[in-house]
C-alpha cells in the first residue's frame, strides 16, 4: 500500500519533578537542603531512513508519546533524563503543524534529524532555592510539560524528473524502457495510481531519477481525479517531461492536451511553470502521428524543442535522455512552499516572531475570570501546590507579572472566582 499523507499526534515527555529533601546525617547538624532536580523528558525526533518508501506504518500507529524524565531524589541526586523517541520516516517527508499551518521540517537526506516535539525540562529541587535569607527552603518545581502537537506528514517523492500528461499517453511505458522500474501498464485510464521511481542511465555516464506520476485530467488543481495526489509529488522535480499522445488515438487533440496540462500546473500555484519543460511526442509509430506533430509545432513557439519518440519501438530515446541530462545540469532545485531562497549557504535567516503576551484575561457569562497564556500556564503546571512555600511563590510570580492589577482593572473584587486551566481560586484584593 502506498500512503503519502497521514495525520498523527506527538507528545514529548514531561520533565521530572524536583524534590524537597534535607541532608540528615550523623554528626552533620543543619545539613541544609538536598533535594535533587528532575530529569529532562524525551524529545520526539524524526529521522530519515532511506529504506522506507511510504508512510504506511503511520496508518496503524498514529499516537507517539515519549517518556517522562525521572523525579529528583534526596542527597541532591538528579533524576535520569529520558531517551528521545526516534521515529523513522521516508525521504521527502514534510512535517506540518495542523493547528498553526507551520512547516516544522522538510526531511530529504538519509540520517537527517528534526525535533518535532520538544521535551520539558526537569523541575528544580529545593537545593536550588536556598538563599542567605532562606537557607532551608521547602519549595520545589514540578517538571515542565512536554510539547504536544497534531501534525500532518506529507510524502513528496524525490525525483529529478517528473513525467506528466493525460492518462494513457505512455508515461509508464516510457519509464519501463529507460529504467529497471516495472510500473503497472494496461489499456485503461489511471493504471498508475501511485508514483513509480526509476534510475535512468543517459548512456554517457550521467544518470538521474525519473518519476512516473499518476495521470492528470482537467480540474486536477481543484482535486478532480487524482488531483492533489499527483501535483504533490511533482513539487520536488527539477525538470518536467510533458508526454503527449501525438497519435490522437482516443480522439484527443495534442495541442489542446498540452495547454490543458500546463493550465493545471499553473493553477496549482507552486511555481511549477518556472521549471524547465521538455515536450515528448509519444506514439510516433501510430498512424496520423507525423501529421499531428507538424500541426502541433505550428502552434507552439519555434524555440521550444519537441522530441518525437515511440516508447513501444524504443526509437528517439537516446536523444531525449541526453537532453534531459543536459537540462538537469543547468537547473537548480526549487524551494517548496515559497520558502525564501538564500544566495549564500552561510547566511543566517532571522524570522520575526510576534511575542505573545504573558497572560490574557477573559470573562465568562457567570462572572468567572479566566486566565490564559503560554507563560502563565507553564508557571502554573510547574508549581507544586502540595507545598505552602510553592503556592506563596506562585502568588508572588503572578503579582510580579501584573496579573493582580490587571484583574482589578477588569473589575475583579474580593471573593470573585478566577480560573486558570482546571484550577479555580478566589481573588483577594
From Swiss-Prot:
Domain Obg, chain residue ranges per copy: 1-158
UniProt subcellular location: Cytoplasm
Gene3D superfamilies, alphabetized: GTP-binding protein OBG, C-terminal domain, GTP1/OBG domain, P-loop containing nucleotide triphosphate hydrolases
Matching CDD domains: Obg
Region described as Disordered: spans on this chain: 124-145
Cofactor requirement: Mg(2+)
Domain OBG-type G, chain residue ranges per copy: 159-329
Assigned EC number: 3.6.5.-
Enzyme class, broadest EC rank: hydrolase
UniProt xrefs under SUPFAM superfamilies: Obg GTP-binding protein C-terminal domain, Obg GTP-binding protein N-terminal domain, P-loop containing nucleoside triphosphate hydrolases
Residues at which GTP binds: 165-172, 190-194, 212-215, 282-285, 310-312
InterPro entries reported for this sequence: G_OBG, GTP-bd, GTP-bd_Obg/CgtA, GTP-bd_prot_GTP1/OBG_C_sf, GTP1-OBG_CS, GTP1_OBG_dom, GTP1_OBG_dom_sf, OBG_GTPase
GO cellular component: cytoplasm
Positions contributing to Mg(2+) binding: 172, 192
GO molecular function, one term: GTP binding
Domain OCT: 351-429
GO biological process assignments: ribosome biogenesis
Key word Translocase present: no
Chief site of localization: cytoplasm
Keywords assigned: Cytoplasm, GTP-binding, Hydrolase, Magnesium, Metal-binding, Nucleotide-binding
A Pfam family this chain is assigned to: DUF1967
Protein function: An essential GTPase which binds GTP, GDP and possibly (p)ppGpp with moderate affinity, with high nucleotide exchange rates and a fairly low GTP hydrolysis rate. Plays a role in control of the cell cycle, stress response, ribosome biogenesis and in those bacteria that undergo differentiation, in morphogenesis control.
NCBIfam families in UniProt: Obg_CgtA, Obg_CgtA_exten, PRK12296.1, PRK12297.1, PRK12299.1, small_GTP
Family the entry assigns: Belongs to the TRAFAC class OBG-HflX-like GTPase superfamily. OBG GTPase family.
Assembly and oligomerization: Monomer.
Protein name: GTPase Obg
Species name: Listeria innocua serovar 6a (strain ATCC BAA-680 / CLIP 11262)
Amino acid at each position: 500500500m502506498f500512503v503519502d499523507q497521514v495525520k498523527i499526534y506527538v507528545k514529548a515527555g514531561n520533565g521530572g519533578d524536583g524534590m524537597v529533601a534535607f541532608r540528615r546525617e550523623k554528626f552533620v547538624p543543619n545539613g541544609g537542603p538536598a533535594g535533587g532536580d528532575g530529569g529532562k523528558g524525551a524529545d520526539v525526533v524524526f529521522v530519515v531512513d532511506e529504506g522506507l518508501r511510504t508512510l504506511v506504518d503511520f496508518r496503524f500507529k498514529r499516537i507517539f508519546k515519549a517518556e517522562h524524565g525521572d523525579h529528583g531524589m534526596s542527597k541532591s541526586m538528579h533524576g535520569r533524563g529520558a531517551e528521545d523517541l526516534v521515529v523513522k520516516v521516508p525521504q521527502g517527508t514534510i512535517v506540518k503543524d495542523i493547528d498553526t499551518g507551520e512547516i516544522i521540517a522538510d526531511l530529504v537526506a538519509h540520517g537527517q534529524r528534526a525535533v518535532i516535539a520538544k521535551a520539558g525540562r526537569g523541575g528544580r529541587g529545593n537545593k536550588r532555592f536556598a538563599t542567605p535569607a532562606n537557607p532551608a527552603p521547602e519549595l520545589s518545581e514540578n517538571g515542565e510539560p512536554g510539547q504536544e502537537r497534531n501534525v500532518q506528514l506529507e510524502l513528496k517523492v524525490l525525483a529529478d524528473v517528473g513525467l506528466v500528461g493525460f492518462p494513457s499517453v505512455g508515461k509508464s511505458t516510457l519509464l519501463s524502457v529507460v529504467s529497471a522500474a516495472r510500473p503497472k501498464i494496461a489499456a485503461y485510464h489511471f493504471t498508475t495510481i501511485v508514483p513509480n521511481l526509476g534510475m535512468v542511465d543517459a548512456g554517457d555516464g550521467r544518470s538521474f531519477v525519473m518519476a512516473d506520476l499518476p495521470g492528470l485530467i482537467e480540474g486536477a488543481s481543484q482535486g478532480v481525479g487524482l488531483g492533489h495526489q499527483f501535483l504533490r509529488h511533482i513539487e520536488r522535480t527539477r525538470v518536467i517531461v510533458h508526454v503527449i499522445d501525438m497519435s490522437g488515438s482516443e480522439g484527443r487533440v495534442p495541442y489542446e492536451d498540452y495547454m490543458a496540462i500546463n493550465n493545471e500546473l499553473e493553477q496549482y500555484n507552486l511555481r511549477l511553470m518556472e521549471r524547465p519543460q521538455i515536450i515528448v511526442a509519444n506514439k510516433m509509430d501510430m498512424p496520423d502521428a507525423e501529421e499531428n506533430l507538424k500541426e502541433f509545432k505550428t502552434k507552439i513557439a519555434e524555440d521550444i524543442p519537441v522530441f518525437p519518440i515511440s516508447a513501444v519501438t524504443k526509437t528517439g530515446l537516446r536523444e531525449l535522455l541526453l537532453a534531459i541530462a543536459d537540462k538537469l545540469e543547468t537547473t537548480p532545485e526549487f524551494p517548496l512552499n515559497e520558502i525564501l531562497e538564500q544566495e549564500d549557504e552561510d547566511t543566517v535567516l532571522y524570522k520575526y516572531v510576534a511575542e505573545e503576551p504573558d497572560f490574557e484575561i477573559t470573562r465568562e457569562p457567570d462572572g468567572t475570570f479566566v486566565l490564559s497564556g503560554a507563560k502563565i500556564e507553564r508557571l502554573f503546571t510547574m508549581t507544586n501546590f502540595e507545598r505552602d512555600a510553592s503556592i506563596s511563590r506562585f502568588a508572588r510570580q503572578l503579582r510580579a507579572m501584573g496579573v493582580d492589577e490587571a484583574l482589578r482593572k477588569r473589575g475583579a473584587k474580593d471573593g470573585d472566582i478566577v480560573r486558570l486551566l482546571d484550577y479555580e481560586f478566589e481573588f483577594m484584593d
